[in-house]
Amino acid sequence: MKIFVGNVDGADTTPEELAALFAPYGTVMSCAVMKQFAFVHMRENAGAVRAIEALHGHELRPGRALVVEMSRPRPLNTWKIFVGNVSAACTSQELRSLFERRGRVIECDVVKDYAFVHMEKEADAKAAIAQLNGKEVKGKRINVELSTKGQKKGPGLAIQSGDKTKKPGAGDTAFPGTGGFSATFDYQQAFGNSTGGFDGQARQPTPPFFGRDRSPLRRSPPRASYVAPLTAQPATYRAQPSVSLGAAYRAQPSASLGVGYRTQPMTAQAASYRAQPSVSLGAPYRGQLASPSSQSAAASSLGPYGGAQPSASALSSYGGQPAAASSLNSYGAQGSSLASYGNQPSSYGAQAASSYGVRAAASSYNTQGAANSLGSYGAQAASYGAQSAASSLAYGAQAASYNAQPSASYNAQSAPYAAQQAASYSSQPAAYVAQPATAAAYASQPAAYAAQATTPMAGSYGAQPVVQTQLNSYGAQASMGLSGSYGAQSAAAATGSYGAAAAYGAQPSATLAAPYRTQSSASLAASYAAQQHPQAAASYRGQPGNAYDGTGQPSAAYLSMSQGVVANANSTPPPYERTRLSPPRASYDDPYKKAVAMSKRYGSDRRLAELSDYRRLSESQLSFRRSPTKSSLDYRRLPDAHSDYARYSGSYNDYLRAAQMHSGYQRRM
């Protein structure tokens, strides 16, 4: 007969000791001791009954009363209940009696701090779970739930409760409030095949989230940060929403000019044109005080600008179109009227009726407040050529600056310029109607001029490299090169015109730093090729190189506009700051140089906090302050550095590192 002996301490109870205990009652065939119970096989049925009667409750060890009963094969379908967080003071008998009040208990096994109770009926098991879950037993709240492991099937307990190698998958029963660990934890399997080998509390499964993110060393930095640091553009671009770049820059929150310029070579101008419906060259020049969308298509003054110029939107003209396209035509090759922008004498002075000169340029240009005229005039040679920085700020007060212009017509216009203030345009539609040449072009649009809002286009014209925009035209243009405008114009004049508060309206310090910094200062072809749609790049590349250089425009003019950053005038600066992590600029043919260069880049005392790329990866440098690179374990070993001492002395000097290390450095073993 098979006798179950419960509450046995398997650690200090041997099968021989147990067999000797049962021997007086009959022949003991075998004895198997598990961790907390044992099975004794006796030959005679009567001897087994006598042993059960005599030894049930017997204390084999002080304080451990044996549970001796006939081993019963478990019914084929029992309901297995997992009981977690069982107090060490709670015996299987006590637990069994607790559950037996709710129904018949087939089996109750306590393993360390959890137990399994097998009940005969499902209803009883569910009632027991409902009533006992969270109940305090011997000072600990037990966690009771239906075991998710399939019910044990088999004739006896001994075979099923063996294998000590099966450890619980997880489950910290010290936290009963977790509502059970049934889904992830296999206490059942743990106990089902094992009541042995549990030397510690079962561990709860690793949660699906991870407290620590991927190492920042492996995380790719966001691409945008490499385009151009946000600081490349003046804070005014980022901070001021009213800059009339408006839609263009406000729409791209990172607003790094690098991004803006890379996609739209003509920069914000394209965007601002894209945003305005009438989107004609006229619109920006005609009323730069107007917000781009306030001019209707009817108000488009393409006629006044070139008469012959197609109504192609400035978007295309500024965007990526070839040099011959509409705007470039209008600026570069177009006859007298739009040569106006390159050959300013003709355009401003003796300009055709359809142009600005005779049309009382006062009215047409003065419409633009100082802010908006900025962009358009800043690019036009004659108008700014002799002008001082102060003169570029307000056209209303600039009789003198216009007198100095080469065109005779400006001397005549000094009175209208002096007389009219930028503000006066909103109130003088008559000025437009009365102009001689405005009949076709402007006379029909007084409302458009009068009603235009005061948001200047200045942002779009000033902020974008105005040069870029009209450069084409200037490169291909006739006699009057840029020299008047950009070359002769003092640095102060240029900066004033671009960055003075009046010029930009709301942006006091918005020098062209960012726009110009993103393109190289001297070579037009290089700067355009680097940041333009291919076809436009081709057209720019094809145009005379003297666009910037030959016209006598010194790089100083640009450098003074806080473009000192661009040291190398002939190469486009890299879109992100080079660091010691950047690949070498050129391959080193000399192996000594290569080894030394690599050892410098991967030297073991370089802290990540000193490498600006990693600084950019993290909000705070503190996370990297204590994590030096471990070059001794680094997989990027130096190349073949063993041929002579001079070659590897630079890279192997971490053996002598202690003399060089600063005190804050922690050697990581």
Swiss-Prot record:
Region (TRBP-interacting domain) residue spans: 307-354
UniProt biased composition (Low complexity): 287-303
One example GO MF annotation: mRNA binding
UniProt region (Disordered), positions on chain: 148-175, 193-232, 284-303, 569-590
SMART domains: RRM
Record flagged with keyword RNA-binding: yes
Gene Ontology CC: cytoplasm; nucleolus; nucleus
Top-rank lineage group of the source organism: Eukaryota
Predominant localisation class: nucleus
Cross-link Glycyl lysine isopeptide (Lys-Gly) (interchain with G-Cter in SUMO2), where in sequence: K126, K135, K138, K149, K153, K164, K600
Function per UniProt: May function as a nuclear receptor coactivator, enhancing transcription through other coactivators such as NCOA6 and CITED1. Regulates centriole biogenesis by suppressing the formation of aberrant centriolar protein complexes in the cytoplasm and thus preserving mitotic spindle integrity. Prevents the formation of the STIL-CPAP complex (which can induce the formation of aberrant centriolar protein complexes) by interfering with the interaction of STIL with CPAP.
PANTHER family: SERINE/ARGININE RICH SPLICING FACTOR (PTHR23147)
Name of this chain's protein: RNA-binding protein 14
Species whose genome carries this gene: Bos taurus (Bovine)
